[in-house]
């Protein structure tokens, strides 16, 4: 009889196998836990993005925002005085209107230079120079007596104030991480939208009671006020000069508060940017050469052009349809400002919430006040998921605004819709700007110049086209056509939503492969 001597061993082998499996599984779990702890530790060990407190950062962004408001305010305070200016300078209203697109063209071009110098020498000195030139231009405008002087000085005024918009984007990039950009971006856009909202009211009051020259005296005083604010309180934020804010800048580049009050921050030289950026006025154009940047910038500019045309014709529509005075027209612009302010608590918080929600879905860890590497995060989905509903809402509200005006409905209904347009559109602007900042870390000034260039040129076209279009087809169909253009071109933005992350990964892999194949070039060796 044959005896199977292996039979008794079979169960033991099975037990050993199970024990080995359990042991391996436990080891794997332990290694996984250790890996997660190490990964978490690596996130926590990343340097703090800004050594400044939340209050300090908010204050700096508030100054940057209201300094940037000088640019659009210089446009809109001018609107109520157009007829008076034409009469006093003995020229046609058409000739005076030519100064509007001229202003916007220079407003778009000048920031490319301001951005380049701020990257090299710092934000603060460029603010001070820009505001000084702006004050001089407004002084000349208040004293000038002919049309040629008006055109030249308006272009100078535009060039000096336009740079402050790009500087605001640079300050945002210096201070704020991607996780917080939604709510902080609302601070930055506040001045940009408050300028158009309050400008007509202030311009109407000054023009009606003190004459058109008072508008430029007011703008000169406003520029002087912000010059003193920057001189006294605004500290340098350029990361190649002050790092996370703890490194003292050059003595000539310190605010008066820093000079007379000792800074309690402990200097961290390791937070300084690796190299000082050279002066390159074409940096903003280079940003637009990237297809993702180009699409997002151009769609944002298209939205801005439509919004600018809505603001520009609002005054004349109120005068013609409701017989309002300049002061009443100015008061009707207040819903634009209130709606924009409230976007800080509506759209801004929603954008930050969605950033965190999408990060959790993708397994992307966020650490407060640490700027994470977004190359492995689908940031396009995080930002544009919120943008699309707000874009459709903006389209709907603009159409409603046009037809309410067309049928001369009660002004209260128009003002409610105007409030909603401002609130939702500002949210789109915040999400658009946040995405572009995320895609271009460390290039805030050049990015601001690129955004300003595309928006101002599109805005100039929109403002120039809207009045003839309304005269031909009416404000209802004009508003519908504007919203239609936004909807028809929306697939371009959806392309960024669906393909943008893939494009970035491919570009990153190509860049890594190029460095491996050309190590001498990558290291800078001759």
Curated annotation (Swiss-Prot):
One of its GO terms (molecular function) is transmembrane transporter activity. Residues 1-49 are annotated as: Disordered. One of its GO terms (biological process) is xenobiotic transport. GO terms for cellular component: plasma membrane. PROSITE patterns: MFS (PS50850), SUGAR_TRANSPORT_1 (PS00216). Its main location: membrane. It is a multi-pass membrane protein. Keywords: Glycoprotein, Membrane, Transmembrane, Transmembrane helix, Transport. This is MFS-type transporter clz19.
């Amino acid at each position: 009889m044959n005896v199977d001597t292996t039979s008794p061993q079979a169960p033991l082998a099975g037990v050993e196998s199970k024990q080995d499996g359990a042991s391996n599984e436990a080891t794997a779990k332990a290694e996984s836990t250790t890996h997660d702890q190490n990964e978490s530790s690596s996130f926590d060990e990343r340097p703090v993005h800004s050594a400044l407190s939340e209050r300090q950062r908010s204050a700096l962004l508030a100054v940057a925002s209201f300094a940037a408001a000088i640019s659009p305010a210089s446009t809109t305070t001018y609107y109520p005085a157009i007829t008076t200016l034409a009469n006093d300078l003995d020229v046609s209203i058409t000739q005076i209107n030519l100064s509007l697109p001229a202003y916007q063209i220079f407003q778009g071009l000048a920031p490319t230079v301001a951005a380049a110098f701020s990257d090299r020498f710092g934000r603060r000195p460029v603010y001070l120079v820009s505001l000084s030139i702006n004050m001089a231009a407004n002084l000349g405008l208040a004293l000038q007596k002919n049309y040629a002087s008006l055109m030249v000085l308006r272009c100078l005024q535009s060039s000096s104030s336009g740079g402050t918009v790009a500087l605001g984007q640079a300050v945002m990039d210096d201070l704020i991480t991607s996780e917080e950009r939604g709510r902080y971006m609302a601070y930055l856009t506040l001045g940009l939208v408050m300028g158009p909202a309050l400008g007509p009211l202030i311009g109407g009051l000054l023009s009606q009671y003190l004459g058109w020259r008072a508008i430029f005296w007011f703008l000169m005083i406003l520029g002087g006020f912000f010059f003193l604010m920057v001189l006294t309180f605004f500290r340098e934020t350029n990361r190649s000069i002050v790092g996370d804010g703890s490194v003292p800048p050059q003595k000539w580049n310190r605010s008066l508060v820093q000079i007379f009050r000792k800074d309690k921050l402990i200097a961290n030289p390791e937070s300084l940017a690796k190299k000082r950026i050279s002066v390159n006025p074409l940096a903003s154009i280079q940003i637009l050469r990237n297809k993702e940047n180009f699409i997002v910038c151009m769609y944002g500019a298209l939205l801005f052009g439509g919004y600018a045309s809505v603001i520009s014709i609002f005054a004349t529509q109120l005068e013609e349809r409701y017989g309002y005075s300049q002061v009443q027209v100015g008061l009707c612009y207040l819903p634009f400002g209130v709606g924009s302010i409230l976007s800080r608590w509506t759209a801004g918080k929603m954008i930050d919430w969605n950033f965190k929600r999408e990060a959790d879905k993708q397994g992307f860890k966020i650490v407060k006040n640490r700027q994470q590497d977004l190359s492995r995060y689908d940031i396009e989905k995080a930002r544009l998921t919120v943008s699309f509903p707000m874009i459709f809402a903006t389209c709907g509200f603009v159409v409603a605004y046009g037809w309410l005006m067309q049928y001369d409905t009660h002004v209260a209904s128009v003002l409610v819709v105007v409030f909603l347009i401002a609130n939702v559109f500002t949210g789109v602007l915040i999400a658009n700007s946040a995405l572009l900042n995320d895609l271009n870390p460390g290039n805030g000034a050049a990015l601001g110049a690129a955004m300003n260039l595309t928006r101002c040129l599109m805005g100039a076209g929109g403002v120039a086209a809207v009045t003839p279009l309304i005269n031909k087809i009416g404000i209802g169909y004009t508003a519908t056509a504007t919203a239609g253009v936004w909807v028809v071109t929306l697939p371009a933005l959806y392309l960024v939503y669906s393909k943008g992350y893939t494009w970035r990964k491919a570009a990153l892999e190509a860049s890594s492969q190029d460095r491996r194949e050309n190590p001498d070039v990558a290291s800078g060796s001759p």
